[in-house]
UniProtKB/Swiss-Prot annotation:
This is F-box only protein 8. GO terms for cellular component: ubiquitin ligase complex. The gene is Fbxo8. It comes from Mus musculus. GO terms for molecular function: guanyl-nucleotide exchange factor activity. Residues 68-111 form the F-box domain. InterPro entries: F-box-like_dom_sf, F-box_dom, FBXO8_F-box, Sec7_C_sf, Sec7_dom, Sec7_dom_sf.
């Protein structure tokens, strides 16, 4: 009886082992087949990748043999962006490569108006044969001439029909241009007070704090290096323009153009005192308030104190 049970158990165990071995063999065979397929696929991809790399290297080699990449294949938007950073000389060189783009009128029009914001010719019907590329060259040439001799520069602009012979048109041109030498411009404005008058009226100081407005004014119209009649003229014109732009504030503070004139001179002197390394004993806030109110008695003490703080924190008004 016991031996019979032992035989049954042994046969059952052997059957399980045989089943397990058979399953293992089938699974192992499947794994090997799959591995073989993956290896074959990988080998095929590697071969394909090798072919792609070969073609890329071959194409690159052929490009190198031909020379530079054809820049005309770039998108127009990218080409316009690149060309917008070039000056006239570089654009002429680029025209050898980008013939169509370098001669594009919209590009040259943008370059002209971004550098010279106002010209009389912009508002006229273009003459026969007009091009913004040619205009850019003339504006560049005229600016260089102005920086050598202001009168000759303005005469050049007028002879080319770029500017009208009008103080207002010349003032607008100067106001919207940043390529003119400020020293030559100062000499020109000192001689052409009619242009200076129109240039001052182009400034808008509405709702600006007095020292900040004075800084903006002197950024466009540079102050002379020494005191004199021209500096007095600039401050006088600024004072009247500042009051005209802020009538409500002037009534509220009780200020007149003469009072603003005094404040401007005080701000210039304070700027020199606080920023000059040669002045060891700097003017205190109390001293500035006392001296300023002595010259203009109707000015608020708090307002004068704010003026001092502005110069102390921000710096010179005519730097």
């Amino acid at each position: 009886m016991g031996q019979g049970l032992w035989r049954v158990a042994r046969n059952h165990h052997l059957q399980q082992e045989a089943y397990s071995e058979t399953g293992y063999l089938s699974r192992e065979q499947s794994r090997r087949v799959a591995s073989s397929n993956i290896s074959h696929t990988s080998h095929r991809k590697q071969a394909q990748g090798g072919i792609d790399i070969y073609h890329l290297l071959k194409a690159r080699k052929s490009k190198e043999q031909e020379g530079f990449i054809n820049l005309e294949m770039l998108p127009p938007e990218l080409s316009f962006t690149i060309l917008s950073y070039l000056n006239a000389t570089d654009l002429c060189l680029a025209s050898c490569v980008w013939q169509d783009l370098a001669n594009d009128e919209l590009l040259w029009q943008g370059l002209c108006k971004s550098t010279w914001g106002h010209c009389s010719i912009y508002n006229k019907n273009p003459p026969l044969g007009f091009s913004f590329r040619k205009l850019y060259m003339q504006l560049d040439e005229g600016s260089l001439t102005f920086n050598a001799n202001p009168e000759e520069g303005v005469s050049y602009f007028m002879s080319k029909g770029i500017l009208d012979d009008s103080p207002k048109e010349i003032a607008k041109f100067i106001f919207c241009t940043r390529t003119l030498n400020w020293k030559k411009l100062r000499i020109y404005l000192d001689e052409r007070r009619d242009v200076l008058d129109d240039l001052v009226t182009l400034h808008n100081f509405r709702n600006q704090f007095l020292p900040n407005a004075l800084r903006e004014f002197f950024r466009h119209i540079h102050a002379p290096e020494e005191r004199g009649e021209y500096l007095e003229t600039l401050i006088t014109k600024f004072s009247h323009r500042f009051c005209a732009c802020n009538p409500d504030l002037m009534r509220e503070l009780g200020l007149s153009p003469d009072a603003v004139y005094v404040l401007c001179y005080s701000l210039i002197l304070l700027s020199i005192d606080l920023t000059s390394p040669h002045v060891k004993n700097k003017m205190s806030k109390r001293e500035f308030i006392r001296n300023t109110r002595r010259a203009a008695q109707n000015i608020s003490e708090d307002f004068v104190g704010h003026l001092y703080d502005n110069i102390y924190l921000i710096g010179h008004v005519a730097a």
